[in-house]
């Protein structure tokens, strides 16, 4: 990498999971639109065909970036300036178990990738993979900045740091962005003032997918009273800011978010599908309850069908049968890369180990707060303490992250079972909990062969 005038050129980005059908395209688009960056993206994926398709798609953009599919992770990582990771840990067969096996025991999960039984088993598969990633990064590109998009986010980032303490890594999630956008819509509706998400200040703190906003303002306007009026207006029927909540598995009417504000006095800053999984079974008692709160259980069968559609789309684009235009994705990975290269500072929310940015959470717990991005540095901004009422909800999950990591490293079934039973949505007897745990262990046995 070198600088020419106000540009960073000859950059090398290693993309682990470079066959991605969605995240890779977003990165391609944002890189193509950023004129101050130039280089090569090395695409590595165990699904070689998908990586080759992305190579063809990326190179069709005719941008200042080249894309190269490589067959070894070592070649991708060697001397990389940045590493991007977005993988599916396991297959949809394992995900089917993660999400749907617990339903036989009355446990419903709207996502199943971060918490609950699904989040646990996804983590048990993911952590060993990330141990290997961290060791290879240490060997081949120890000074690279690592951007993680994979879930469970907090445990992925924790594993990277526990394995390679000097790693320069952070996790990115767009859930907070949607809540910030919702606040701007509240400001427009209640006060007639239009602004963009980036124009408002929000103090963000928590853990990934269970983040909270404790302060928010636009210029001199305190946005909490505005949001309170907005919630009061819409808390019965909801507010569908992304279209009819029934039109997409990813839409909601924000009723969970509004209910949490009513109960706890702070703004829950994630989508309802994620927020519901972190609380006791108020919102996930059964499918009928989910419908009442106007969000969705996302079936894995839909994900399988959607993946097939995305693969076909990739093939059409690669053959030139369908056009692929670069459009701004709304993600911040490229903005973060620019800032780390010294091309303009940035403040945004990211997931990194706690170094004191949250006062009442143990050090090294991976937390999500605002951080300052500047040349070769990510500096967490002090966010204060998690409010006591909110911490009562968050506490079991913070403890579970520590237990799950330890269970995965030690390959300890008893500790993993204990973590599952500790989850607030797992309201089972020990006997039934162990039956579910053993069934899910069998379903993901290929990844947990030498556990005891």
For the regions a language model picked out, list residue spans one by one.
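A short, basic/flexible loop-to-alpha-helix module at the beginning of a structural domain
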Residues: 1-8, 38
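N-terminal Rossmann-like dinucleotide-binding module
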Residues: 10-41
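NAD(P)-binding Rossmann-fold cofactor-contacting core
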Residues: 37-59
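Short acidic low-complexity segments
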Residues: 66-79
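Redox-cofactor binding/interface segments in oxidoreductases and associated redox assembly factors
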Residues: 78, 84-85, 148
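Rossmann-fold NAD(P)-binding glycine/threonine-rich loop
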Residues: 93-163
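Internal, well-ordered domain-core segments that constitute the primary functional module
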Residues: 133-217
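Long, compositionally biased stretches enriched for glycine and/or charged residues
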Residues: 191-452
